[in-house]
């Protein structure tokens, strides 16, 4: 037979209120009437470990719901961004000779084009390592042609990422207001 719990102890509470390493979070509200203010940020780096670290960093940074895309195959990335309804994709370009399949700017732009074709509201940003000054002109041209929405050479600092998240949030709001206006016009017609 079990003794009665001591008064004042945390584990004496009904419902198991004892100390837990894992905090229970309520799932975010969802459904047709709920507005989603935080963008889903998909991350796709050159290795699964780097992708996980980047997604964890985004989670700690806050202001988004991070999503790690562990495959770097173009079709997989496009499919997952589309299926998960990503609002932002952060990709790492890799120009090194040590990479099995170097992911150059052209390959990243191919992914970006397909994503924007299927999810026009998704913003795509590239991160590139320092030491490749010849690549900057190609990056600027990709932004000018609106193949990508921006890039960062070197380490991505939190302020730059917050700026990109803010841009994605604004894009979400603009798309939502267009949808609302369209629905209003349909009702009037």
Predicted feature residues:
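Conserved N-terminal glycine/acidic-rich loop preference
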Residues: 50, 85-88, 134-150, 163, ...
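Short beta-strand/turn micro-motifs composed of small residues
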Residues: 45-46, 91, 126-128
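Active-site residues of response regulator receiver
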Residues: 91-101
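Acidic, metal-coordinating helix/loop segments flanking the phosphotransfer/catalytic sites
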Residues: 70-88, 95
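Non-catalytic signal-transmission and effector/linker regions of two-component phosphorelay proteins
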Residues: 1-60, 67, 75, 158-189
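Active-site phosphate/pyrophosphate- and oxyanion-stabilizing loops and adjacent acidic/basic residues
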Residues: 56, 113, 140
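Alpha4 helix (beta4-alpha4-beta5 surface) of REC/receiver domains from two-component response regulators
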Residues: 102-106, 110, 123-151, 156
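Conserved phosphotransfer cores of two-component systems
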Residues: 82-84, 114-121
């Amino acid at each position: 037979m079990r003794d009665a719990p001591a008064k004042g102890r945390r584990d004496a509470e009904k419902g198991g209120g004892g100390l837990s390493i894992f905090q229970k979070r309520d799932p975010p509200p969802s459904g047709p009437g709920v507005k989603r203010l935080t963008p889903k940020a998909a991350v796709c780096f050159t290795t699964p470990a780097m992708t996980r670290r980047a997604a964890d960093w985004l989670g700690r940074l806050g202001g988004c719901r991070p999503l790690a895309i562990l495959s770097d195959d173009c079709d997989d990335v496009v499919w997952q961004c589309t299926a998960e309804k990503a609002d932002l994709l952060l990709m790492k370009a890799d120009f090194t000779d040590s990479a099995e399949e170097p992911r150059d700017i052209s390959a990243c732009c191919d992914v970006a084009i397909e994503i924007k074709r299927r999810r026009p509201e998704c913003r795509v940003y590239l991160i590139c390592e320092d030491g490749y000054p010849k690549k900057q002109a190609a990056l600027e041209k990709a932004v000018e042609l609106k193949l990508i929405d921006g890039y960062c050479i070197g380490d991505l600092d939190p302020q730059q990422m917050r700026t990109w998240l803010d841009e994605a949030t604004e894009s979400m709001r603009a798309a939502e207001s267009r949808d609302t206006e369209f629905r209003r016009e349909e009702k009037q017609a």
